[in-house]
A protein has these predicted regions:
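Conserved beta-strand termini and adjacent loop/short-helix elements that scaffold enzyme active sites
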Residues: 55-57, 79-82, 136-138, 163-166, ...
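Phosphate- and divalent-cation-binding pockets in alpha/beta enzyme and binding domains
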Residues: 16, 62-65, 227, 236
Length: 241
């Protein structure tokens, strides 16, 4: 199995929570902070099989200190987000020089759960042997939820037919939203350009999904996904601890 590079975009300002420290190190319990959930997905994987790349800004260097606890377990590197780049797409683009051949983006302020016994690393590597891109998605049909997510339209074989970030029209054609995505290094530029034009609402798209490896790539269904970017969601999780 090739080494998998895990990109964690953690350069957001976290204005919804207004914490005095990076939201990624918000404690969920005595042992774990939010960002630990991303590392837990690779627990037991040897150092030579996974590398972590964390994208930060100058106000979030506390993350570097917090993640030092993994220094004997994993290769971890940090890079600043290019100030000329914006949104999560800009954070990921800022880490391009650190990509491996096989890569996965995880959002470090979320909790992603896979079916019991499923290895994220093995599943992603298997998909990237066949496809250049793969969304990890959660099925969803609620209109209000879809309006806040990066939405996908999948066929009966979980292949991607359409994508739009936070759609306002034709919402009911979508049947899920992405929670993470994996890609081959060589496919990155086309895929991120397509996704970014939707995220930034640049108007008439210059790049169609059919022109990218995203089109008809097979997606991976997750068991559950929680975005902890709001106090409402955090309170729900803390009440279950």
């Amino acid at each position: 199995m090739n080494k998998l590079t895990v990109i964690l975009p953690a350069a957001g300002k976290g204005t919804r929570l207004n914490l005095p420290y990076p939201k990624e190190i918000l404690r969920l319990n005595k042992e774990k902070a939010l960002i630990d959930s991303s590392f837990d997905l690779f627990d037991g994987l040897p150092r030579n099989k996974v590398k972590f790349v964390v994208v930060i800004n100058e106000e979030k260097t506390e993350i570097v200190k917090y993640l030092a606890k993994y220094k004997s377990q994993y290769d971890i590197c940090f890079t600043y987000q290019n100030p000329d780049e914006i949104e999560y797409t800009g954070a990921i683009k800022s880490a391009k020089h650190l990509f491996g051949e096989n890569n996965i983006v995880l959002l470090p302020d979320t909790l992603l759960t896979l079916p019991k016994g499923v290895s994220l690393a093995q599943t992603v590597q298997h998909h990237l042997n066949k496809y250049e891109f793969a969304f990890l998605f959660k099925p969803e049909t609620d209109k209000q939820m879809l309006m806040t997510k990066g939405c996908v339209q999948l066929d009966e074989n979980m292949r991607v037919l359409a994508y739009e970030d936070k759609p306002s029209d034709n919402i009911f054609k979508f049947n899920g939203y992405w929670c993470s995505f994996a890609f081959k290094k060589g496919a990155f530029d086309e895929c991120i350009a397509f996704m970014e034009q939707s995220t930034l609402k640049l108007g008439q798209p210059k790049l169609l999904i059919e022109q990218t490896p995203i089109f008809k790539s097979k997606s991976i269904e997750v068991e559950d996904f929680k975005d902890l970017g709001t106090w409402e969601e955090i309170t729900k999780i803390l009440s279950q601890s």
